[in-house]
Regions:
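Cytosolic nucleotide-binding catalytic cores of signal-transduction proteins
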Residues: 4, 22-25, 43, 47
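DNA major-groove recognition helix of helix-turn-helix/homeodomain DNA-binding modules
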Residues: 44-59
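Charged, helix-prone or intrinsically disordered regulatory segments positioned adjacent to compact structured domains
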Residues: 57-79
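Short coil turns linking two alpha-helices in DNA-binding domains
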Residues: 16, 27-30, 42, 56
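Short basic helix-loop element that most often maps to the first helix and adjoining turn
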Residues: 4-19
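Alpha-helical transmission elements in cytosolic ATPase-linked domains
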Residues: 1, 33-36, 48
Length: 79
């Protein structure tokens, strides 16, 4: 669930893995591993990620965060 939430938050903000990694001073592959569930950030890094996305740490670890649908996608579905 953590990996899914990280990916959803990153995409909601239009952020690439590379940009997220740069802002956290880590390599892109680390972000990828977190999102795939192959590794997990330590407690200090979880705090930094929560600060980056302006969310509580509990929301990173809690319920699944849904990705917001693209407005173009919604318009296409309504047409």
């Amino acid at each position: 669930m953590l990996g899914e939430n990280l990916k959803a938050l990153r995409k909601q903000r239009g952020m690439s893995q590379e940009v997220m990694a740069q802002q956290l001073n880590i390599v892109r592959q680390t972000v990828s591993k977190w999102e795939q569930g192959l590794s997990v950030p330590d407690a200090q890094m979880l705090t930094r990620i929560a600060e980056l996305f302006e969310v509580p740490v509990s929301s990173l670890l809690g319920e699944k965060i849904e990705e917001k649908a693209d407005t173009d996608e919604i318009a296409a579905q309504l047409a």
